[in-house]
Curated annotation (Swiss-Prot):
It comes from Oryza sativa subsp. japonica (Rice). One of its GO terms (biological process) is system development. The gene is NAC010. This is NAC domain-containing protein 10. It is found in: Nucleus. The NAC domain includes a DNA binding domain and a dimerization domain. Transcription factor of the NAC family associated with male fertility. Involved in anther development, but not in senescence. Reduced expression of NAC5 via RNAi leads to male-sterility.
Amino acid sequence: MESPDSSSGSAPPRVLRRQQQQPGSAPELPPGFRFHPTDEELVVHYLKKKAASVPLPVTIIAEVDLYKFDPWDLPEKANFGEQEWYFFSPRDRKYPNGARPNRAATSGYWKATGTDKPIMSSGSTREKVGVKKALVFYRGKPPKGVKTNWIMHEYRLTDTSSSAAAVATTRRPPPPITGGSKGAVSLRLDDWVLCRIYKKTNKAGAGQRSMECEDSVEDAVAAYAPSSQQHATAAAGMAGSDGAGGVAAAHGGDYSSLLHHDSHEDTFLVNGLLTAEDAAGLSTGASSLSQLAAAARAAATPCDATKQLLAPSPTPFNWFEAFLPRAKEFPSGLSRSSRDIGDMSLSSTVDRSLSEAGAVAIDTGDAANGANTMPAFINPLGVQGATYQQHQAIMGASLPSESAAAAAACNFQHPFQLSRVNWDS
C-alpha cells in the first residue's frame, strides 16, 4: 500500500477519518489534546466557515441553541471541554421588527457587560474580522435577577466583511419572512454565532490564597516558638528564687521583652513585644503588672551602648554656656583684672545694677547679701556650687583654695564691653 506523501499536502489517515465523521459525533482526539484557540482563530477558522457552510475538519464545536438551556446544563451538551465549552448557536430577535437579540433562557437571562471588543486579524492589514461580547447569566427575571458565576463570550462576524458568511450573519434586521401559516413571522436574527461558556472561579482562588497566607503565618509562629522558649528558660535561670521570674518561665512567656526598668540608671528599655505560646499564658503567667515588671528586671540587662550613653561625665555641665551668649574676645594688651574695670563701662542699666549689687555685697562682707543677692542676679537658674564661686572670683571676692579650683574648672567668662571699642567694625 502506497503511503501518502506529506509533501503533496495529503492528510494522514487519522485526519481523513476525522474529516469523514458525521456532524454532532464526539471527536477522536489523541490524549493530551487541548483546545485553546485565540479569538481570531475562532472567528476566521471556525465561525466564518460555519456561516458559509464550509465543512470543518473536526466537529469539536457542537451545534446547540444556548437559549433553550441553563448554563449548568450545557457542559453535557458539548463535544469537548473540561473547564470551558464551545458551541455554535443561532440567535433570535426579541421583537419581530427589531434588531435586539432575545437573551432569555430557561430559568434566567443573559445580560451583556461592557462594550463590544473588536477582533483584528494578525496580518499586515490588521482588518477587523469579528466582534466579541461578554455576558453574565442571571437567575430569575429582570431587573431582579440574581447574578451567577456563569460567563459567556459571544463571537459574531462584522457587518462590513466581504465574505458570504458576513452577509449571512449581518446585524441589520432582515425583512420578516412569512412562514407557511398565515401571519407567521420568522424571528431569526443570526444563523450562527460562536459562544464560549465557562464558570468563573475567582472566589475559590481568593479563598485558596487566603488559606495559603494563614499557613505561612502559622509556619512563622511555629518557627519563632523555639526561640521564645529559649528566652523563657534564660529568664528562669537569671531570676533564681524570684517567684515572679519562676512563674514567667514556667508558663513559657518571654515577659522580659515587654518592659525593662533599670532602677540605678532610671531608664526604660523596650526590647520587643510580649509573646506567649498560648492564649492562657498571659492570664496565668502573671497575675499583675508588678509581677511582669519584676520578671523583666530579673531577666534583662541593659546593653553596653545604653551603659555608655548613661555613664556620668567627668566634666560638669555649665548651664551658663547653654543659655547665655559667649563672651567676646578682648583685644591684646587689655586685662580683665579688677584694677582695669575703671576703663570699662557697662552698657545697660541691668548690668550696672548687677555690678553695684554685687560690689556692695562683697565690700560689706554681709553674709546675707553676699549669699542671697548674688544668686538672684548672677545665678537666675538656681545653679549653685562651682559656677557661683567663679562669679565671686570674677567680682573680686576672696575664695578658699578648693572654691577657686572649682571656679577655674568651669571656664566661665562674663561678658563685658569696652567704652571706646567699636565691636561692629
